[in-house]
Amino acid sequence: MAVISLLFLAVMYVVHHPLMVSDRMDLDTLARSRQLEKRMSEEMRQLEIEFEERSRAAEEKQKAENFWRGDTSNDQLVLGKKDMRWPFQASGQDGGPLGWMLGNLWNAGLFCLFLIFELLRQNMQHEPAFESSSEEEEEEIRVVPVSSYTWLSGFPSQEALESFYKHYIQNAIRDLPCTCEFVESFVDDLIEACRVLSRREAHPQLEDCLGIGAAFEKWGTLHETQKFDVLVPIVPPQGTMFILEMRDPTLGRRCGCVKVDSECVCKNEKLLGDVLCLVHHRDHSAMLSKCTSSIKAALCTSSHLDVYKTVQWFRNMVSNAWALVAHKYDFKLTLPPSTTTCKLRLDYRSGRSLSISLVLGVQREDTLVYLVSQAPEREQFTSVDWPESFAACEHLFLKLVGRFAPDNTCHLKCLQIILSLQDHQTLPPGASRPILTSYHFKTALMHLLLRLPLTDWQHRMLSQRLQDLLWFLGRSLQQRSLHHFLIGNTHLPLTIPIPKAFRNAEPVNLFQHLVLNPVAHSQAVEEFHNLLAQVKTLPCSPLAGGL
């Protein structure tokens, strides 16, 4: 019986808690394993209930048969006897008090062993799911005091919101997916032509582009979809490496410098025996020095990659590449002046035009965090400072949400409705530019997507989720605290590749400037109340200027 009990506990542990192979399992396997674990748990629970019922019925039947036969030796209730034997002892044995004590110790040991296994299993589960959220956070979002929602009274109905979306947003972005696909294809064509031109030059190499921003993340409104941002990663040529020197984020700016240096495999690998390194051999050192010196002279300032020089070099490359591929397209391409991005303007004969911004980026390690050439709005950087960008990480997160969420979810509609109204909002008197930006609303939405199950974002819940989004941002304004979605977010799925230090870092407050500037905070609150007024009068007030 002891061996059977131990084997039963081991089988139960293996069935309920399969061993995890790696922290970074792919998403499909993760979803299937969770579904299988849930189904097996339900089946095991049902089998345990049936086993207990059958055991109880068999025991009662046996007692009844013994009673009618007059055999009451095993009936403790009739005889008032107490079985002092060890629970796992054979019926013919009598262990006495010592056996009873050993039996209790055996049961206690098995219980402790099972408890240790359970604690270890819980400590090994670090992978957060989109559907999972802590109880405290879920209560924080879903169980809100009634007084907190008083300023959301008179909110439009589901039908009114759907009607607004259909007439003012859906038609305006109908062709957006096809346009995004064309933009990426066109930029890839230009990059391939640039590679042909730069084969014999010791200059940075261009990798495949990645569309980022509102248009490619499918939440852009008419105003946001007039421009397309495309990230173009660059890597050093052979024999050269980029060394990222990050600035101290406590100084208020997240950026870094890209140092250019020579590279050789012998610096990273231990060569066996008396092996000659061709790069560092005196016959090839001149060639290596010439390659590195060429980049430093053309693109660097004090051995660091210069944003302005690098962008100008890239603009010249694109201009020359256009001459190779112009015969494929039926539009006119111009390059408006810019110091931090390579801007492209496509003018069609029909009068339609597209604006594309090519942003250069240097990848941080094996993550989707890049040091980019384009600085955020309202911030000034030196020519050797490359701002840190999380656009690729956020793009991946929203893409994964769309993959795992039910069909026809409303999370992007919530953002589009708010931004459509904000685009046609008049600024408060004396204000030169808005305080609340589309990135603030997008950040609030991504926080809610992690805290609420994806099943709560179904199409019929548009009105409730829009209220949640406005409440979340309104509470953040009251507290003057809106945390960055990626930095210091311990609930971020491990499938989003960011530097490990970011997960355990202190959260970054995007509203820190509102703490230091009461005037800006007052303007942000006024903008928010104006937005609420627009939402509440949505059914009966067309947008100024139309869409």
From Swiss-Prot:
Residues 28-66 form a coiled coil. GO terms for cellular component: membrane; plasma membrane. Its main location: membrane. The keyword Plastid does not apply. The chain crosses the membrane at residues 97-117. Keywords: Cell membrane, Coiled coil, Membrane, Signal, Transmembrane, Transmembrane helix. Disulfide bonds: none annotated. Residues 1-16 form the signal peptide. One of its GO terms (molecular function) is receptor ligand activity. One of its GO terms (biological process) is negative regulation of T cell receptor signaling pathway. Residues 17-96 are extracellular. It is a single-pass type I membrane protein. It comes from the Eukaryota. Residues 118-547 are cytoplasmic. It is found in: Cell membrane. InterPro entries: ITPRIP-like, Mab-21_HhH/H2TH-like, MAB21L/cGLR. Functions as a ligand of CD3E, inhibiting TCR-CD3 complex signaling to regulate T cell activation. Induces stable CD3E-NCK1 binding, thereby preventing the CD3E-ZAP70 interaction and subsequently inhibiting the activation of the downstream ERK-NFkB signaling cascade and calcium influx. Belongs to the ITPRIP family. This is Inositol 1,4,5-trisphosphate receptor-interacting protein-like 1. The gene is Itpripl1.
